[in-house]
A protein has these predicted regions:
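Juxtamembrane intracellular "pre-TM" segments in multi-pass secondary transporters
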Residues: 7-24, 202-236
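Substrate-agnostic recognition of the 12-TM MFS/MFS-like secondary transporter fold
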Residues: 25-43, 63-79, 85-99, 115-174, ...
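Short amphipathic helix-loop junctions that connect adjacent transmembrane helices
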Residues: 43-56, 250-265
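Transmembrane alpha-helix termini and helix-breaking/packing motifs in multi-pass membrane transporters
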Residues: 46-52, 105-106, 164-184, 258-259
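MFS-fold secondary transporters
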Residues: 50, 103-107, 123, 196, ...
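C-terminal transmembrane bundle of multi-pass solute transporters/carriers
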Residues: 72, 89, 103, 114, ...
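Small-residue-rich packing faces within the transmembrane alpha-helices of Major Facilitator Superfamily
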Residues: 98-99, 105, 186-193, 305-309
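Helix-loop junctions on the cytosolic side of multi-pass membrane transporters
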Residues: 136, 140, 182-212
Length: 317
């Protein structure tokens, strides 16, 4: 049938990107490792804060300090990616992230909740240039006709590692100590930087290829986003959704510790299940409902409502 043929054609495009494009494969692998490093920390930190405070609200701040800097500084990371060597930006960001993980390890030993939250927020601050820089480098390693599929793979990477990283983080805390997990995690960021540096192709756009009209300041970029209703609405939607999600997802830890008595392992399983959904969702939505950007925009409100509805049923499980 036509549907099966289209499905096989799309699958073939994804397969070619992952098996025949070495530069893309390396950039994607580095992204997976970095996201995995972030999520390895999240589950044990949620458990640590909840053990110290037994307060769901304070526990939710772990996810707030993780996501807020990415939202606030992400556009600045894009600004840096347009003006400086992208490999160097990634290397500096990853090196600082690895050092910050060791700083988090020290903060945990103090059992000072504010200090722990501050150190975890600092990890998001120093790591904030990585994602926009990695995104900006994508057209440098992928042909224009394959860019749509590459974007789907790239943005589904969050779901892959939210599942694998969080699940693995929860499991590893039952095998090794949390402190050992933090020490190992610091090395993942170094590994990611090394992989990116092994990419032979230049990841930075050449200045002569850029249109002068595109060379705008960071302030002008913010003003442009604020002046465009569609862009501004998407930014507000993303920000408010992240805030509400942080409060809700922190309850995974409360459920795992107080109801199911499964500790970090149970929290990791729940975050892992969420990650599987986040992996399947973008691919399924694009295939069935959003073949164009306009159609994709129309699915945002419906999917957010569906997200809330499904989480509504968790207390009845």
């Amino acid at each position: 049938s036509v549907t099966v043929e289209m499905l096989m054609e799309n699958f073939q495009k994804y397969k070619v990107l992952l098996t025949q494009n070495q530069n893309f494969r390396k950039l994607f692998a580095a992204r997976l490792i970095t996201l995995g490093g972030d999520w390895l920390l999240t589950v044990p930190l949620l458990g640590i804060i909840y053990e110290l405070t037994e307060n769901p609200f304070i526990t939710s701040l772990v996810l707030v300090v993780q996501s807020a800097p990415l939202f606030l500084l992400g556009s600045f990371g894009g600004y840096l990616a347009d003006r400086f060597d992208r490999k160097k930006i990634i290397a500096i960001s990853e090196f600082l992230s690895g050092m910050t993980v060791l700083f988090i390890l020290y903060a945990v030993t103090t059992e000072n909740v504010i200090f722990i939250l501050f150190s975890f927020g600092l990890l998001s601050v120093v790591g904030s240039p990585y994602m926009p820089t990695s995104d900006a480098a994508l057209p440098n390693v992928v042909k224009k006709e394959n860019l749509a599929e590459a974007n789907v793979i790239f943005f589904s990477s969050w779901g892959v590692m939210a599942g694998l990283g969080a699940g693995l983080g929860g499991y590893l805390t039952t095998v090794i100590s949390r402190n050992m997990l933090f020490a190992i995690d610091s090395l993942t960021f170094v590994l990611s930087a090394l992989i990116v540096f092994s990419i032979k192709k230049n990841l930075s756009e050449k200045n002569e290829d850029k249109n002068k009209e595109e060379d705008i300041s960071y302030k002008e970029g913010l003003q442009y986003a604020a002046s465009k209703k569609e862009i501004f609405s998407l930014i507000i939607t993303k920000a408010t959704f992240s805030i509400s999600a942080s409060g809700l997802l922190s309850l995974f830890t409360v459920l795992s510790y107080d109801i199911y008595k499964t500790g970090d392992f149970g929290t990791g399983l729940m975050f892992g299940a969420r990650g599987v959904g986040a992996l399947i969702g973008p691919i399924a939505i694009r295939y069935f409902f959003g073949r164009t950007d306009g159609k994709l925009l129309n699915t945002i409100g419906i999917t957010i409502m569906a997200w809330g509805l499904f989480y509504f049923f968790i207390p009845f499980s």
